[in-house]
A protein has these predicted regions:
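Short glycine-/acidic-enriched loop or helix-start segments at secondary-structure transitions
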Residues: 60, 137, 174-175, 268-270
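Short, acidic Gly/Pro/Ser/Thr-rich loop/turn segments
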Residues: 45-46, 55-57, 147, 170-173, ...
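A short, polar/proline- and glycine-enriched secondary-structure boundary/capping micro-motif
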Residues: 58-61, 175-176, 300-305
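Short pre-catalytic strand/loop immediately N-terminal to key active-site residues, enriched for Gly-Thr
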Residues: 65-69, 179-185, 202-203, 245-247
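Glycine-/charge-enriched secondary-structure boundary and capping motifs
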Residues: 1-24, 45, 65, 99-124, ...
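Short, acidic (Asp/Glu-rich) active-site segment that either coordinates a divalent metal cofactor
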Residues: 51, 151-194
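Glycine-rich phosphate/pyrophosphate-binding loop regions near the starts of catalytic domains
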Residues: 11-165
């Protein structure tokens, strides 16, 4: 079994580069192989940038999922932040930290999952770095663009707004609880871009740490409270029915969009037609200290510390 230490840094970089199409896209002026990537941005656009760290033992466990699945989830988690801003993706940077004795096949499958998932969503891998470390980890930086001043933001909510969420929640948490992760969500990139044109759109955030936790972040940024109806929260299908309510409320890694709309804006049916996705109204924003009301005691969400 060949290990990373058997091939060295530059050979490993070359092997990862082979996972990327030689012509990554018209917006990529310079891709992998130079000191930095060069990406084209249209006139009248703002650059959107986000970074996520994905660390073995904290964010993924290779005894519960394949390296490729872990890599796919890392890419989706980073791209989902672009979706929450309503941005179109431009490129992805990957900083990979690898223990020297890691099997080469493990690292390449992990990178293959990242590069493949990014390409699937129109986001070429355009550069990065490889370093030695004690634990396998990936730090991804996603770059996107949005019309100047038109990015969706989590601080645009107002008391009286109605709250909506796309898709269904809880499947990723359900699989983690069972010790076998196979499901990989999808970043709602197209839906985020379409949301920017919705009349009365308020705040927006992606559901990465759990519905309740992320709604709490939206409330803090917008300086409002929220009240949700747990019975209306859409729960993902599971064997024998639906995932438990607590996992839909606090599970995390759903990568759906949670957003608010002014009272005079469209309802769930019109939003479904606009976004091309299931959309459910789950509550509203209210005046008051930043907190989520209406939930049973217990559900919180993922925390790094």
């Amino acid at each position: 079994m060949r290990r990373v230490s058997d091939v060295g840094e530059f050979d490993l970089i070359e092997r990862i580069a082979r996972l990327v199409p030689r012509r990554p896209g018209p917006g990529v002026r310079v891709g992998i192989g130079d000191d930095a990537a060069v990406l084209g941005v249209r006139r009248g656009e703002d650059l959107v940038a986000t970074t996520d760290a994905f660390v073995a033992g904290d964010h993924f466990r290779l005894d519960q999922e394949t390296p490729r699945t872990a890599g796919r989830r890392a890419a989706v988690g980073c791209l989902s932040d672009l979706a929450a801003m309503g941005a179109r993706p431009l490129g992805l940077l990957l900083a990979l930290a690898v223990p020297a004795r890691t099997p080469l096949a493990t690292v390449l499958d992990f990178a293959r999952g990242i590069a493949g998932e990014a390409a699937r969503h129109g986001t070429p891998l355009v550069g990065g770095n490889v370093a030695r470390a004690r634990e396998l980890s990936a730090t991804l930086t996603a770059l996107g663009a949005v019309a100047r001043g038109r990015a969706l933001r989590r601080d645009r909510g107002r008391a009286g707004d109605r709250l909506f969420v796309t898709g269904a929640l809880g499947r990723s948490a359900f699989e983690r609880a069972r010790g076998s992760v196979r499901h990989v969500g999808a970043p709602r990139l197209r839906a985020g871009q379409r949301l920017r044109g919705v009349r009365g759109i308020g705040a927006c955030i992606d559901v990465s740490d759990g519905l309740v936790a992320d709604l709490g972040q939206l409330c803090r940024a917008s300086r409002v409270a929220a009240r949700i109806e747990p019975a209306r929260v859409p729960r993902a299908a599971a064997r024998g029915g639906r995932v438990p309510e607590r996992l839909a409320l606090a599970g995390g890694e759903d990568y759906e969009l949670l957003f608010s709309v002014r009272p005079a804006g469209p309802g769930a049916a019109a939003l479904r037609r606009r976004l091309g996705l299931p959309v459910t109204e789950i509550g509203r924003l209210e005046a008051g200290p930043a907190r989520v009301r209406g939930i049973p005691a217990g559900p919180g969400g993922f925390r790094h510390f």
